[in-house]
């Protein structure tokens, strides 16, 4: 005798909003614990306790700690990084495109010590999840490399392997997560300007427009 499939009742807008709010709360609390204790030292039990919820409820939202880290990565990229890429792609001048990208990326990395966790713990994700995160960064790579190539072809940029220059520029911004003093947020704008100026002054021929 066949069982009749049960139709799940669709969520109301209020229920959907509550779910989104709860997910955001879980992501933030988990990320706070990853920053405070380290990813490896943080258990799902600790996260559930900090949220004042039972573990089964936490597993309803995320089946594993690795999946939770992945969802936090995606959420952060969608909210903070992808908008930078969208903005950069609309800038026609390649020098201005690089300047915008480097400045915004530096500010993103300097905004919170959570940036260090997300950069460093990419290695803790499964290969499948790493590939999905890397696909977003591949888009950033192509934007930056394309601008480098345009500047070289126009004679404004120094010759050199495009990939080296791309990793050099983005690496300058990303590496600050390992040494920046996050208690000195008033210096982040100065740092962003410096990273941008140092890279462009080293790469561009002076006086060429």
What are the roles of these predicted feature ranges?
Residues 21-30, 47, 72-76, 80, ...:
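Generic hydrophobic, amphipathic alpha-helix propensity
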Residues 25, 29, 33-67, 71:
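Helix-turn-helix
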Residues 36-40, 91, 112, 154:
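Short coil/turn segments at alpha/beta junctions that flank glycine-rich nucleotide-binding fingerprints
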Residues 75-86, 128-153, 163-167, 193:
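Amphipathic alpha-helical packing segments from all-alpha helical-bundle domains
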């Amino acid at each position: 005798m066949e069982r009749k499939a049960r139709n799940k009742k669709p969520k109301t807008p209020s229920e959907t909003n509550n779910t989104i709010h709860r997910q955001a709360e879980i992501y933030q609390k988990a990320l706070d614990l990853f920053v405070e204790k380290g990813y490896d030292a943080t258990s799902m039990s600790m996260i559930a306790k900090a949220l004042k919820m039972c573990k089964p409820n936490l597993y309803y939202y995320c089946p594993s700690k690795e999946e939770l880290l992945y969802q936090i990565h995606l959420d952060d990229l969608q909210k903070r990084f992808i908008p930078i890429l969208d903005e950069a792609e609309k800038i026609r001048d390649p020098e201005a495109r690089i300047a915008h990208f480097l400045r915004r990326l530096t500010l993103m990395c300097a905004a919170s010590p959570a940036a260090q966790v997300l950069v460093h713990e990419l290695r803790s994700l499964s290969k499948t999840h790493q590939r999905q995160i890397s696909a977003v960064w591949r888009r950033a790579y192509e934007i930056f490399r394309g601008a480098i190539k345009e500047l070289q072809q126009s004679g404004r940029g120094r010759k050199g392997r495009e990939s080296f220059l791309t990793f050099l520029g983005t690496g300058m911004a990303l590496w600050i997560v390992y040494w920046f003093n996050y208690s000195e947020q008033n210096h982040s704008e100065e740092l962003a300007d410096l990273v941008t100026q140092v890279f462009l002054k080293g790469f561009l021929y002076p006086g060429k427009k």
